[in-house]
UniProtKB/Swiss-Prot annotation:
Gene: cpeB
Predominant subcellular localization, coarse grouping: plastid
Name used for this protein in its record: B-phycoerythrin beta chain
Binding site for (2R,3E)-phycoerythrobilin 1: C82
Source species of the chain: Porphyridium sordidum
Alphabetized SUPFAM superfamilies for the sequence: Globin-like (SSF46458)
Length: 177
């Protein structure tokens, strides 16, 4: 995993050059937006349990067969596994947002996820739906448009961070499909 700083150093080192120019400007921007980034991660992790349970509930409401005998969320053990997977995905999305880099998400969460779900018979369309619900929730929290819970954020526009987190959820959806 490379955070924004490590990535700049590795790129400059590969060119045998000092850190400067656009790389240095990108780091300045990353630091300037640091409080907004931390607030965005905090909004996700502070609401993680509710986000995951709401996403799984929404997925089940749209596909009640999941909790019928033989469904993938039938029995407490399977439901717990579904909730656990949602928590893991959300945790790695928050890591990626904190680092400003998707490599931790790709390497430690998405690598082999589709194959695992296929082997376990997990319906991918339902999983993708749960991920899309979490994506909408995360964007709402980051842009402070969640109707039930407002967060205090550092001054400034957070739409770029909302777009960034949305792209991480899109990667999860693409990895599962």
């Amino acid at each position: 995993m490379l955070d924004a700083f490590s990535r700049v150093v590795v790129n400059s080192d590969a060119k045998a050059a000092y850190v400067g120019g656009s790389d240095l400007q990108a780091l300045k921007s990353f630091i300037a937006d640091g409080n907004k980034r931390l607030d965005s991660v905090n909004a996700i992790v502070s609401n993680a349990s509710c986000m995951v349970s709401d996403a799984v509930s929404g997925m089940i409401c749209e596909n009640p067969g999941l909790i019928s005998p033989g469904g993938n969320c039938y029995t407490n053990r399977r439901m717990a596994a579904c909730l656990r997977d949602g928590e893991i995905i959300l945790r790695y999305v928050s890591y990626a947002l904190l680092a400003g880099d998707a490599s931790v998400l790709e390497d430690r969460c998405l690598n082999g996820l589709k194959e695992t779900y296929i082997a376990l018979g997990v319906p991918t369309n339902s999983s993708i739906r749960a991920v899309s619900i979490m994506k909408a929730q995360a964007v709402a929290f980051i842009t402070n448009t969640a109707t039930e819970r407002k967060m205090s954020f550092a001054a400034g526009d957070c739409t770029s961070l909302a777009s960034e987190v949305a792209s991480y959820f899109d990667r999860v959806g693409a990895a599962i499909s």
